[in-house]
Amino acid sequence: MVFFTCNACGESVKKIQVEKHVSICRNCECLSCIDCGKDFWGDDYKNHVKCISEDQKYGGKGYEAKTHKGDVKQQAWIQKINELIKKPNVSPKVRELLQQISAFDNVPRKKAKFQNWMRNSLKVHSDSVLEQVWNIFSEAASSEQDQQPPSHMAKPNTEVPTKVPSTKTNGTTEEQTEAKKNKRERKEERQKSRKKEKKELKLENHQENLKGQKPKKRKKGQEAGHEAGGEDAAEANGAPEKKRARDAQASEEGADRNGGPAEDADEGPTKTAAGKRKRQKHSEVESDNKKKKMKLPGQPEEGEPEDHEAPSKGKFNWKGTIKAVLKQAPDNEISVKKLKKKVIAQYHAVMSDHHTSEEELLAIFNKKISRNPTFKVLKDKVKLLK
């Protein structure tokens, strides 16, 4: 549908409504098309049936409009109407109707739709007139169909030699169509390629994160396994020693009980006293062993430093060592660099574990400093709060 703007009042009008607008607006002498911008004086606008589309308007210099099958058929249909107007057998009333029909660019090509369109657009309600117009169209269409078969029969012989070079030129035509693509199509292709690249990057990052997390979990599991294995081994080594001590005690007690009948009566009381002393010693040894077992593993024994107990437990007291270093410093304050150096040196001296890397140790150290409320970090220094 073509739209015009009135140069007198500036109102936009459809092509069908131009005559009505001219009767209202007396100064209307020139109309300009909204799409192409051309000016039409007087009745010249009637010949302007079709205008450029939005794709042609905004497509750029090298844009070529695609031919639609419907448009081709519609143009052929309107051509047929123009040919029928020139025929002498047509009545003047029907000729006027045909002239009005030729001004439209959306004329239906089927009987029911055509007659309905005539009633609504041209306000023709007499069935006899509608039948006359349609009969003229149907006769013209049937005459054309009768003439077409011989031309179709003659085409295959002529098309055989021309088909061979068409295969060679397919590549060049495809390249030309790609070069003449729209700006919109190019933008869409770029956006699609960018989206694909973003998705690929996200997948790669996700896979790298998964790979980085798995070995850490394995390391933790291995360390826990090593600790559990060390404790089991210590218990297994301690069990035979206990059994040996019990066997030795039982043998000595048996010897004390069975040793008296072959000896003299004078030696009897001395042996019984010695046996009592031995039993007392064994009971004292057993009580000492029980006391040692009852002691907690974290409590140090008398005369032994706390640092010697740490490797057997498998843990390093980060909080205690940091506190000790800060207490030794003046005003309970020291630089982060010095504190880090001293604490990690103490860790290596106490722990025999070489699995943990320097980066992990630094991460643990920073975590202990920042999350503990007893330590206050001010710029590059750490202070112990009371």
UniProtKB/Swiss-Prot annotation:
It is found in: Nucleus, Nucleolus; Cytoplasm; Cell projection, Cilium, Photoreceptor outer segment. Residues 141-150, 164-174 have a biased composition (Polar residues). Residues 177-191, 198-211, 240-249 have a biased composition (Basic and acidic residues). GO terms for molecular function: DNA binding; DNA-binding transcription factor binding; identical protein binding; transcription regulator inhibitor activity; zinc ion binding. It comes from the Eukaryota. Residues 172-214 form a coiled coil. Zn(2+) 1 binds at residues 6, 9, 21, 25. Zn(2+) 2 binds at residues 33, 36, 48, 51. A zinc finger (C2HC LYAR-type) spans 1-26, 28-52. One of its GO terms (biological process) is erythrocyte development. Expressed in testis (at protein level). One of its GO terms (cellular component) is photoreceptor outer segment. The keyword Zinc applies. There is a cross-link at residues 14, 202 (Glycyl lysine isopeptide (Lys-Gly) (interchain with G-Cter in SUMO2)). SUPFAM superfamilies: beta-beta-alpha zinc fingers. Residues 141-316 are annotated as: Disordered. Keywords: Cell projection, Coiled coil, Cytoplasm, Immunity, Innate immunity, Isopeptide bond, Metal-binding, Nucleus, Repeat, Ubl conjugation, Zinc, Zinc-finger. PROSITE patterns: ADH_ZINC, ZF_C2HC_LYAR. InterPro entries: LYAR (IPR039999), Znf-ACC (IPR041010), Znf_C2H2_LYAR (IPR014898), Znf_C2H2_sf (IPR036236). The keyword Chaperone does not apply. Interacts with PRMT5; this interaction is direct. Interacts with GNL2 and RPL23A. Interacts with nucleolin/NCL; this interaction is direct. Interacts with phosphorylated IRF3; this interaction impairs IRF3 DNA-binding activity. Plays a role in the maintenance of the appropriate processing of 47S/45S pre-rRNA to 32S/30S pre-rRNAs and their subsequent processing to produce 18S and 28S rRNAs. Also acts at the level of transcription regulation. Along with PRMT5, binds embryonic globin promoter. Represses the expression of embryonic globin Hbb-y gene. In neuroblastoma cells, may also repress the expression of oxidative stress genes, including CHAC1, HMOX1, SLC7A11, ULBP1 and that encoding the small nucleolar RNA SNORD41. Preferentially binds to a DNA motif containing 5'-GGTTAT-3'. The N-terminal zinc-finger domains are required for the appropriate production of 28S rRNA and the formation of pre-60S particles. PANTHER family: CELL GROWTH-REGULATING NUCLEOLAR PROTEIN (PTHR13100:SF10), CELL GROWTH-REGULATING NUCLEOLAR PROTEIN LYAR (PTHR13100). This is Cell growth-regulating nucleolar protein. It comes from Rattus norvegicus. The lineage of its organism: Eukaryota, Metazoa, Chordata, Craniata, Vertebrata. The gene is Lyar.
